[in-house]
From Swiss-Prot:
Subunit structure: Homodimer.
The family this protein is said to belong to: Belongs to the GrpE family.
Keyword Cytoplasm (UniProt): yes
Function recorded in the entry: Participates actively in the response to hyperosmotic and heat shock by preventing the aggregation of stress-denatured proteins, in association with DnaK and GrpE. It is the nucleotide exchange factor for DnaK and may function as a thermosensor. Unfolded proteins bind initially to DnaJ; upon interaction with the DnaJ-bound protein, DnaK hydrolyzes its bound ATP, resulting in the formation of a stable complex. GrpE releases ADP from DnaK; ATP binding to DnaK triggers the release of the substrate protein, thus completing the reaction cycle.
Keyword Chaperone part of the UniProt annotation: yes
The organism's taxonomic lineage, starting at the top: Bacteria, Pseudomonadati, Pseudomonadota, Alphaproteobacteria, Rickettsiales
Major localization listed first in the record, in broad terms: cytoplasm
GO molecular function: adenyl-nucleotide exchange factor activity; protein homodimerization activity; protein-folding chaperone binding; unfolded protein binding
Gene: grpE
Location(s) in or outside the cell: Cytoplasm
InterPro entries for this protein: GrpE, GrpE_coiled_coil, GrpE_head
Name the UniProt record assigns to this protein: Protein GrpE
Length: 178
């Protein structure tokens, strides 16, 4: 009789255990699915955070590089005027004029150094080079037998860019078919 009780108790324990496992299996499956979903969300969120960080770093770098663009555009005319003044210096002049010209040259050189330090580059196309609408602004087309069509025949004003961004296109005249 004790053996029967033990067997009945064992059977009852086994039945209860099976019942618990049967009830727990869907919960375990559900919890495993939830864990997988959470892992997937974590991976996606981590990737999104990483992409956002990269975008912000790029935006910060661009802002730093191009923050001076508006100010630099205004200085371009100063550089042009200094170049024009130096291009028209008199051949024979007294000491005062020579000193003024030297001062203008030093100012132009210092401005060029500042431009270089801030990655501002002059666009000065060669005569005869081909017109590039990304860098040049054609103000006129002139028939010219010595030049290919769309080649630059006159540089009217230098252009400038800061890194890869155009500040001002070079103003040119281009040849057209005759």
């Amino acid at each position: 009789m004790i053996d029967d009780n033990i067997e009945n108790n064992e059977q009852t324990i086994n039945d209860i255990a099976e019942e618990i496992v049967e009830k727990a299996n869907p919960e375990i499956t559900e919890l495993k699915a939830e864990i997988e979903e959470l892992k997937d969300r974590l991976i996606r969120t981590t990737a999104e955070i990483d992409n956002t960080r990269k975008r912000l770093e790029k935006a910060r770098d661009e802002a730093k590089d191009y923050a001076i663009a508006t100010f630099a555009k205004e200085l371009l005319n100063v550089s042009d005027n200094l170049s024009r003044a130096l291009a028209h210096k008199p051949a024979n002049s007294d000491i005062e004029v020579t000193n003024i010209i030297a001062g203008v040259q030093m100012t132009k050189d210092e401005l060029d150094k500042i431009f270089h330090r801030h990655h501002i580059e002059e666009i000065k196309p060669e005569i005869g080079s081909m017109f590039d609408y990304n860098l040049h602004n054609a103000i006129s087309q002139i028939e010219h037998p010595d030049h290919e069509p769309n080649s630059i025949i006159t540089l009217m004003q230098s252009g400038y860019k800061i890194r890869d961004r155009l500040l001002r296109p070079a103003t040119v005249q281009v040849a057209k078919k005759s």
